[in-house]
Amino acid sequence: DVNELNDVEERRAVVPQVWEIDIMITKHNDEIIQIEER
């Protein structure tokens, strides 16, 4: 949905810290998953 996408972009513009933290958490979780797969 284009409107939903625009809402997300607007929220990111207002609070860039939030999605940066989300990305850090995602990367952290990916690393944990990789460690568990070994």
From Swiss-Prot:
Expression sites by tissue: Found in the whey fraction of milk (at protein level).
Keywords attached to this entry: Glycoprotein, Milk protein, Secreted, Sialic acid
Main localization (coarse): secreted
Keyword Ribosomal protein found: no
Top-level lineage group: Eukaryota
GO cellular-component term (any): extracellular region
The keyword Glycoprotein is assigned to this record: yes
Protein location: Secreted
Reported modifications of this chain: O-glycosylated. Contains sialic acid residues.
SUBUNIT field: Homodimer.
Protein name according to UniProt: Very early lactation protein
Organism: Trichosurus vulpecula
